[in-house]
Amino acid sequence: MDSTVYIGRRARLARCLRDAGGGVAVIATAPERNRNSDNDHPYRHDSSFHYLTGFDEPQAWLLIDADGAASLLCRPRDPAREIWDGLRLGVDAAPATLGVERAFDVAELDAVAPELLADRPAVWYPFGADAGVRERIHAWLATLRGRARSGVQAPAAQRDLAPLLAEMRLHKDAGELATMRRAAQISAGAHARAMRFCGERFRTDPGGAVREYEIEAELLHEFRRHGAQSPAYPAIVAAGANARVLHYAAADAPLRAGELCLIDAGCELDGYASDITRTFPADGRFTPAQRELYEIVLAAQAAATASTRPGARQRDAHHAAVRVLAQGMLDSGLLDRNRDGDVDAVIASTAYRQFYMHGTSHWLGRDVHDVGEYLSLAEAPCDTVDATGRPAVSKPSRVLAPGMVVTLEPGLYVRPAAGVPERFWNIGIRIEDDAVVTETGCELISRGVPVAAAEIEALMR
């Protein structure tokens, strides 16, 4: 994206500040993180900072006045350090390159920032920001209060910037959606590669095993060779019973013929995440029990997809998926009709949570669990259930609109238990796709990898 995109975003934020009474917004990029000794983790910018600037160097701050003026503080050019760490944009090039009105050496931050905040009604910053950011801002306010006898006023209010940024980021423009489609395409290709890899291994060595980390390596290779900068989150590659663990991380167990493999993985491309989950048979053929549960989950995702459209509530997809899953639990014998009742009773009692205990949908964007309010805060409270399924009173979930992006990810996770048919024990299944809300419904942008059981089996042959 060229600088005009970021200039437009900063102008929108400035309008939001004016509408809320004025002030100055302060956003710092992410700090560098030490791994050990003199080695740092690979650097990743703060998502909102990059959303407003397109600038991905560390040690940078952005201040935006309600009148629209943007000031960037960044590292200066340093030929000696650039030998070791690479080229820097530098202060002199920043205004023309990034479209900001002013640029300063970040070493001057504590002198420049108070001047930009002086006599402004409010300072806006993300209240969940790094503690160092809050401390820095409080120090600037103290500096300004010390100049009160000179007629200088410190901002009287501190306001949370995070909700304004979240609302902006929730609605994607055409450029953002194009990047997310490409990220989903790369990730879908990686999932397909992993399926083909397992199919080939078990064709040549039916009695052998594939380690989870071998499959993960196939994913990472495909991400990087197509230009993705990194995984969007640590990949979950779960063999057999490990698929019952929602955030499984070990990635060192063997996958054997007859077991399922659950992969939850997506790449990050140019600052945007993808998030795909597929569950497939290690040797390329579902057992009858595996396929029975798989078809239930796939039907639940179809119901969630049909419920994802403009004017629908964000939570509608979850309710639709739960109804299909609950009916499937009764039909398959996971739940006992005599004990648990019909589908409405199963939902009312939350008995389904024995096998499906997480939500179906979350926002997707620059972060894999992206920012954005899930509730419609302007509406009156309504009766609902909390995260554990207990009755609660809450705001209704917000209404979906074109340009929003969500995941749709129902699943079933079966642990050995009395009354649960043994043929289903230790099966874990999740199917997840990325959905762009359109004018008429939603577009699944991650279907470059098969999802139907027969298509998965065909790919692995």
State the predicted function of each range.
Residues 1-461:
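Active-site neighborhoods and metal-handling regions in enzymes and metal-associated proteins
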